[in-house]
Design a protein with these regions (language model features):
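Active-site acidic/histidine proton-transfer and metal-coordination neighborhood
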Residues: 27-127
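Acidic (Asp/Glu)-rich catalytic clusters
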Residues: 1-18, 43-53, 80-89, 115-125, ...
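Active-site beta-loop-alpha junctions enriched in small/polar residues
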Residues: 21-24, 62-64, 95-101, 131-137, ...
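Alpha/beta catalytic cores of nucleotide-metabolism and tRNA/nucleoside-modifying enzymes
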Residues: 202-206, 233-238
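Gly/Pro-rich active-site loop or hairpin
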Residues: 69, 104-112, 136-204, 212, ...
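Structural preference for beta-strand elements that scaffold enzyme active sites
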Residues: 15-18, 55-58, 89-95, 125-129, ...
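C-terminal helical cap(s) of enzyme catalytic domains, especially alpha/beta-barrels
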Residues: 217-235
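N-terminal pre-domain/capping segments
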Residues: 1-21, 25-44, 234-242
Length: 242
């Protein structure tokens, strides 16, 4: 199965393939038993993804439950332990969150602190993955998209932004919610996505849709891809049916 998967990736000329770790994993947990289980599970995720020849494993930071700074430290130690246990070129791309409850990773400064807490020998294998959907929910202004990416560049550096999940949002600004909607049809609207698709600074960033599937997943995915390609061409008259 592994060889068949690798063969299909080559046949379809897929340049970047990533996986997403289990949502049950909590590498920031103060509970030693839960944290140990999470570390074991994340190591298995890395091993499987490495065997499949993937570029990276996408990982949400954990929930700290007690103290935020301690959670960042625990999360970083766990990433380091797992990356050392599974050497190679496979990377971890930390995905920003909506920051609900005690979830880490809603602010760029917190993402930077998490990566900076990693030892030198594994830090180069860790980068970032953002989803526009929760950005307004935690206070970032996508209506003026240049500002968001300038902020990221100033705090972390755009060179460390490896991938974007392209989703509109059903969660209003400031809600700390993360509920996806079809691109251009949610609280974010079409204009920020047009800018993303035409921004030369984001041209080398991988873009993956994660929009709702509803009644017909393949049809809706194709519709979203057509819409994004139209945005990239500068089309400003894309209708809801496209």
């Amino acid at each position: 199965q592994i060889e068949r998967f690798r063969s299909e990736v080559t046949r379809h000329k897929l340049e970047v393939v990533v996986s997403h770790d289990s949502y049950l994993i909590n590498l920031a947990s103060p509970d030693p038993i839960l944290r140990a289980r999470s570390i074991a599970s994340f190591c298995q995720e890395l091993q499987r993804s490495g065997a499949l020849g993937l570029r990276a494993v996408v990982s949400h930071p954990g929930n700290y439950l007690d103290d935020r700074d301690s959670g960042v430290e625990r999360n970083a130690r766990a990433y380091a332990e797992c990356l050392r246990a599974v050497p190679g070129e496979l990377e971890v791309w930390i995905e920003g969150t909506a920051g609900s409850g005690t979830a880490l990773g809603s602010r760029f400064e917190e993402l930077r602190a998490l990566r900076n807490a990693l030892p030198d020998d594994v830090r180069t294998r860790v980068a970032f993955f953002l989803d526009p959907a929760p950005l307004p929910a935690v206070g970032y202004d996508l209506a003026h998209g240049e500002t968001v990416w300038e902020q990221f560049d100033s705090v972390i550096g755009l060179g460390l932004l490896k991938c974007l999940h392209l989703n509109d949002s059903r969660a209003p600004a400031g809600s700390r919610g993360d509920r996806h909607e079809w691109i251009g049809e949610g609280c974010i609207g079409p204009e920020p996505f047009r800018r993303i698709m035409r921004d030369p600074d984001l041209a080398g960033v991988v873009k993956i849709i994660e929009t709702p599937k509803r009644d017909d997943p393949l049809r809706h995915d194709r519709r979203m891809l057509r819409r994004l390609r139209a945005y990239a061409r500068g089309n400003t008259q894309v209708t809801a049916g496209v």
